[in-house]
Amino acid sequence: MKTDLVPSSGAQGVDAEMQAYFYGLADHLKTRLRGEEVYLASFYAEDSDFARFNRALVRQAGHVTQRSLNVDLILGEKSTAGAVTLSGDSTADRARLDALVDELRGRLPHLPDDPHLLYSREVRSTEAHGSSKLPDAPATLASVLDAARGLEFVGLWASGGMYSGFANSLGQRNWFSSYTFNLDWSVYHSADKAVKSSYAGFEWSDAEFTRKLEQCRDQLGILGREPKTIPPGRYRVYLAPVALGEIVDMLSW
């Protein structure tokens, strides 16, 4: 993990590097197979900026690049799976994959046949490369702090690229990338009273963020009113969409 924020101007280059790296590992996996073995591999990676706000100041900031690879090894009607975290160093990562394949191969003789084993044997390769319209992270954080001046602003910022790929020993290659941001925050009126909001998307707008923050200011005014004690009874209650969404999420666990 790096300790300072990195602008997103090189996102497309990272996309190409991630894809080439994954495809290289996929080709290497093919050389490790024996006989009728088949592999399925899924790749997941991110290249993201993060920041934590407290009292309208940036308290923590960082940049994260991480990669992982899941591998299914199939022989006849038997299959087993494992995963490795990738470092980005080709020699080290190929050694990890070699060890994983050996481990998976050692499991197969001890496993029963799986009558429900099913995977596509038809090769359908695709690519979908996202276009990064993400803002420069330091400039955006400065804009957020400026707009939140005077507020008890607490929140989390995340912005960057997400990458996923699929490959198999039959020759199929699939790749997908996207670039998003998410700012989740609360504005406190007092210790037990706060307004929560969020802003997420593909392209940042200062005007849209300011509009959402002004809504928070208006709602803070409501929280500042004299509280009323409501006696027990039956009442009709209005729930904001966000509140109703949280209740539905809880009930759908």
Range-by-range predicted roles:
Residues 1-253:
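Active-site bordering "gate/hinge" segments
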